[in-house]
Amino acid sequence: MKAVVAALAANLGIALAKFAAFLITGSASMLAESVHSVADTGNEVLLRIGRGRSRRARTAEHPFGFGRERYFYAFVVAVMLFTVGAVFSIYDGIHKILSPSELTSPIVAYVVLGLSFVLEGFSLRTAIREANLVRRPGHGWRQFVHLTKTPELPVVLLEDSAALIGLVFAFLGVLLSELTGHDEWDGVGSVGVGLLLACAAFIVGYETKSLLIGESASEETTAQIVAALEGGPEKFRLIHLRTSHIGPDNLLVAGKIGVPAELTAADLTAGIDAAEKRVRAAVPIAETIYLEPDIYRPGQEDPLDPSVAVVERSTRRPRFRSSRRS
């Protein structure tokens, strides 16, 4: 994934430059930004590890594969952002406010912050371009972060956005310290960076927690599955449907279908096979499908089904009350 590689390269170079600037200037804001970039670098490494491990072949112990490794490592990123980035930055900022020390060579900090802004902007632009390839038309960035099943892009987007805002905080901290002669402002800048990282960590953790628990298919994908199941000559009727993302590209589909009483066992088997083929043709990521047949009786449909809330049988067109990630 280009966005992760670009972010990794940018953060590694930025971390070294910021730490050198901290050693020269003694700025708490620069130290906070150094730790921020180190945390981001570690995060990109974790995302790559998770992506690699998710591709392992399924085993007897993990029959559905390892797709959720990507969600787990994205959650670890949130933990790192909070513990390594936010907590340290806030602690160091408070220490600088209580025990201020004079900045030296602030021009070095300005140069490094400017260079960092350019590199972080390049990384964010790469992430935006890659996200636009999969973002649905009409969906804003907030919807994209909330609805996507791919964890790496939202993490990189949030990291890079937080990094750019954090650079502004650090710049203001150094600038106000120099203009006012009160070095406490440098500590305030560090605290601002820490609070920003805490917010980013909360958002990443909240979204990846939901994915780790297991999210259903999106409304659009569910509609395609229902249409595929009921759209064949077998005259199947959906009673209830359960879907769960095993990974971004692996969807588990389990459903109970009502079948005509006159179907023979051979016809039923052939019909279920045909229905599964239609589902996979409509939704290629539906790798695992389980269908339980039952004799159809009117009114048998589950009205409280969380995936298919309302199915208008007269028009054969499904409507849904819920909407989840794409």
Please describe what each predicted stretch is.
Residues 69-326:
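Alpha-helical transmembrane segments and adjacent TM-loop junctions that form the membrane-embedded core
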Residues 40-55, 131-141:
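Short, charged cytosolic
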Residues 1-17:
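Topogenic membrane-insertion module of multi-pass membrane proteins
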Residues 1-6, 35-45, 72-84, 118:
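Alpha-helical transmembrane segments of integral membrane proteins, especially early/N-terminal helices
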Residues 12-20, 25, 33-37, 41-46, ...:
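Hydrophobic alpha-helical membrane-embedded segments
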Residues 1, 27-30, 183-187:
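Residues that define the loop-to-transmembrane-helix transition and helix capping
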Residues 47-69, 99:
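Aspartate-rich (DDxxD/NDxxD/DxxxD) Mg2+/diphosphate-binding motifs
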Residues 23-52, 90, 94, 154-168:
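Acidic (Asp/Glu-rich) catalytic motifs at the cytosolic membrane interface
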